[in-house]
């Protein structure tokens, strides 16, 4: 994927359909499956943040051009107006040349919904064991998956149970034992192996003793 920083508020991507498929996405589903389209978009924005220090914050104006060999996406950060922003991942409409363009404003509400889940990678399985014995909040959804030699914990919070500050605090505790992964959970689930599909930390705690 090519990333070009246009200015302080704008970044341009070019991603081929081959690259999209190599990331575990189908080139058609990203248009018709909103959740999958969002996953790809957030994965791309994470790379932009890592490579160009372009943070995903505030309202974003998105232009998508569907080209013959891939997608050209221009993302511009705007200013928050009246503190109310709405997120919507764009869907393109093709013209007679098989190319299309769509512009859309992202909404903060859906971005916050996306931010309530995280994929945590671990350098060693023992780090997961240590986490399980030092983190005793069991009423969050968590799944353990093995993918390409690494263990990943997919964690989903219930925003009706915990406040945003409480979730941030819990994430900070968990990230003391692992790292936030940029990989999509869909890619990990599709090509990896599910080790424990629910209550993973509880199961690990019960099956593996705490290290001395």
From Swiss-Prot:
Belongs to the MecA family. This is Adapter protein MecA 2. The keyword Magnesium does not apply. The keyword Metal-binding does not apply. One of its GO terms (biological process) is establishment of competence for transformation. Keywords: Competence, Sporulation. Disulfide bonds: none annotated. Homodimer. The N-terminal domain has binding sites for ComK and probably for unfolded/aggregated proteins; the C-terminal domain interacts with ClpC. It comes from Halalkalibacterium halodurans (strain ATCC BAA-125 / DSM 18197 / FERM 7344 / JCM 9153 / C-125). Enables the recognition and targeting of unfolded and aggregated proteins to the ClpC protease or to other proteins involved in proteolysis. Acts negatively in the development of competence by binding ComK and recruiting it to the ClpCP protease. When overexpressed, inhibits sporulation. Also involved in Spx degradation by ClpC. One of its GO terms (molecular function) is protein-macromolecule adaptor activity. NCBIfam families: PRK02315.1-5.
């Amino acid at each position: 994927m090519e990333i070009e920083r246009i200015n302080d508020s704008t970044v341009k991507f070019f991603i081929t359909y081959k690259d999209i498929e190599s990331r575990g996405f189908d080139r058609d589903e990203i248009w018709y499956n909103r959740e999958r389209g969002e996953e790809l978009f957030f994965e791309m924005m994470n790379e932009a943040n890592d490579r160009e220090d372009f943070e995903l914050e505030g309202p974003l104006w998105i232009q998508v051009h569907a080209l013959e060999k891939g997608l050209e996406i221009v993302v511009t950060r705007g200013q928050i107006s009246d503190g109310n922003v709405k997120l919507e991942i764009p869907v393109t409409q093709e013209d007679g040349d098989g190319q299309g363009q769509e512009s859309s404003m992202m909404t903060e509400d859906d971005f916050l919904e996306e931010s309530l889940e995280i994929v945590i990678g671990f350098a060693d399985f023992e780090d997961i064991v240590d986490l399980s014995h030092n983190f005793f909040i069991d009423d969050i959804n968590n799944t353990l998956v093995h993918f390409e030699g690494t263990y990943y914990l997919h964690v989903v919070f219930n925003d009706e149970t915990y406040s945003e500050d409480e979730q941030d605090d819990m994430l900070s505790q968990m990230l003391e034992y692992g790292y936030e992964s940029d990989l999509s959970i869909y890619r990990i689930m599709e090509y990896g192996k599910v080790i424990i599909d629910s209550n993973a930390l509880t199961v690990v705690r019960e099956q593996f003793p705490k290290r001395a």
